[in-house]
Amino acid sequence: MAKREYPLERTRNIGIMAHIDAGKTTTTERILYYTGKIHKIGETHDGASQMDFMEQEKERGITIQSAATTAVWHGFFDQFAKTPYRVNIIDTPGHVDFTIEVERALRVLDGAVAVLDGAAGVEPQTETVWRQATTYDVPRIVFVNKMDKLGADFAMSVESMHERLQVNAEAIQWPIGAEDEFEAVIDLITQEAYYPVDDLGEKWEPREIPAELKELAEEKRNTLIEAVADVDDDLMEKYLEGEDISVEELKAAIRRATLALQFYPVLAGSAYKDKGVQMMLDAVVDYLPGPLDVKPYVANDPKTGEEIDLIADDSKSFAALAFKIMTDPFVGRLTFMRVYTGTLQSGSYVQNTSSDTRERVGRLLQMHATSRTEIDEVFSGDIAAAIGLKNTTTGDSLTAVDHQLILESMEFPEPVIELAIEPKTKADQDKLSNAIQKLAEEDPSFRATTNPETGDTLIAGMGELQLDIMVDRMRREFNVEATVGAPQVAYREAFTQTVQARGYFKRQSGGKGQYGDVYIEFSPNEEGAGFEFEDAIVGGVVPREYIPSVEAGLKDALNAGPLAGFPLVDLKAKLYDGSYHDVDSSEAAFKIAASLALKEAAKTAGAVILEPIMAVDIVAPEDNLGDVMGHVSARRGMIEGQESRGPVLAVKAKVPLSEMFGYATTLRSATQGRGTFQMVFDHYEAVPKNIQEEIIKNSGKEA
């Protein structure tokens, strides 16, 4: 049996999260460089980044898949040389189309580093990932990056956290200089300044704080103490009694408050200019939790339903969550897992309690972004990748065969945008099916369906960029040649009234006939609740063996709604009466009867078409406020608020997705290229009557 290399209290599982272009991947690159994982620094804008390992990532300079890597930290001044820390890092995407990747990563992390652009502060996508991290109770530290950039303003960045995130966040460092003159960092806790002594920022030396900044540094230290004392009783007591607060006491209080999600330490630096990253790594080990510091993960015993706390302990039975599936060109299908308790050896069996299958782990790997180290055993609190788990998908629970548990699975959003994809040849058709299956395993927010009317394959996802990249991957990785249609909105249909309907199917044509007869009550379900089927049959008027066929018939019929053929969603169906024939009834007959009942109900159930409504953030110069307001109202949107962000205005609005196609060009020309916008799916809503009629007409169905 292998021996644990790093104790649990010296393990950190962290994510790097941010708005697109805040410098997240560059920050991760520097972490890998300073922890000795890479020997040459790669720049994102040169397409040489180690963590961005897919072709599309290198070309576009953005991170799409969260790459997991393991690093070892000895401390800024080698203070942990004898007892180093293992830091498992997940680099997550900042583009809204990939929030599913962020959500998955946060689910298995213990702590996170939020990276801000020092010239922009909190941006729309920062708010999105911050909310996601809050949902999963992930403690965070904040790294204000790009302090060398034109317009960088550290005080503004900290203030933007107060205003836009409404959180208790204060600086634990202060930059010396900004923009071209950013040269060093003051540690507010120790009241020392740190200056780099070489070009790559590997060696730094402590110096006295410059005289002109001494007063500011003391004032900021007091602000920090007050903010932490507000949420920490021990520190508050000392502070009120006017006692001196030592470096150790302040650091311990910051750690307690950060772990309790009541305080967020803010640091300054420039990853590109090699400043501040090692101090940020020290803050990761000083203030972010190890697996023993977070509240235990809760699992359920499938036999008794009892809740069981999973505490990181190697001596307990193995339990892990599969949080990502990837296809590696060299070793094939990889299952990334977070081990919550127990250990797992390569070659052993695990029980997938989500699919109720037993699987054998071929090999275990510790992953770097593009390379891997084979390991014999993975321990509790760790992240590793397994080869050989053929039936495991994202969100599945993996446990010891003799001690089965179900870990809470992940929920994935419904796609809001789709496009038709048509393979050029029969060979491409087969390759396309394989590509779709593999890509859907990797990304559960990517779906594929067949249009029942036209037979076209439709692929769907969270945004145009995501679908662009999926089509690109089909071409590059799976050699699929296909014609791709223009993006379409993923409309849905729903009933708004409760109705009862009969489905009666009888066919007699010599020999055995067909007979099925059902009475079903249909009623609207809550938004997002999906389809619910209730069997309310009394006295066997519909025999037991045909009831699953009724449910299956309804599920099939839901794929093409009555108005325009869009999926029918959020529906309750109660089977309450019916009849059967001893000889002629069959599963197929009841399936058809159920679909006929749904068709009948649609005539009087007040069916409507639903469209995805997006939460849109538009940032534009103040002079263009009138233009932006006009854009939103012309697109059937609702303005929800606006705020000033320095020289620009940020407008928040809710706008139907169908109205947002081509908006980037409109905004660019109205603002001379200075306006930007981001959007993320918010909810589905019924379309206005006139637009519903137009959609039905375009679908080729008659209203």
From Swiss-Prot:
One of its GO terms (molecular function) is translation elongation factor activity. Keywords: Cytoplasm, Elongation factor, GTP-binding, Nucleotide-binding, Protein biosynthesis. It is found in: Cytoplasm. GTP binds at residues 18-25, 91-95, 145-148. GO terms for cellular component: cytoplasm. Its main location: cytoplasm. Residues 9-292 form the tr-type G domain. GO terms for biological process: ribosome disassembly. It comes from the Bacteria. Catalyzes the GTP-dependent ribosomal translocation step during translation elongation. During this step, the ribosome changes from the pre-translocational (PRE) to the post-translocational (POST) state as the newly formed A-site-bound peptidyl-tRNA and P-site-bound deacylated tRNA move to the P and E sites, respectively. Catalyzes the coordinated movement of the two tRNA molecules, the mRNA and conformational changes in the ribosome. Belongs to the TRAFAC class translation factor GTPase superfamily. Classic translation factor GTPase family. EF-G/EF-2 subfamily. This is Elongation factor G. It comes from Leuconostoc citreum (strain KM20).
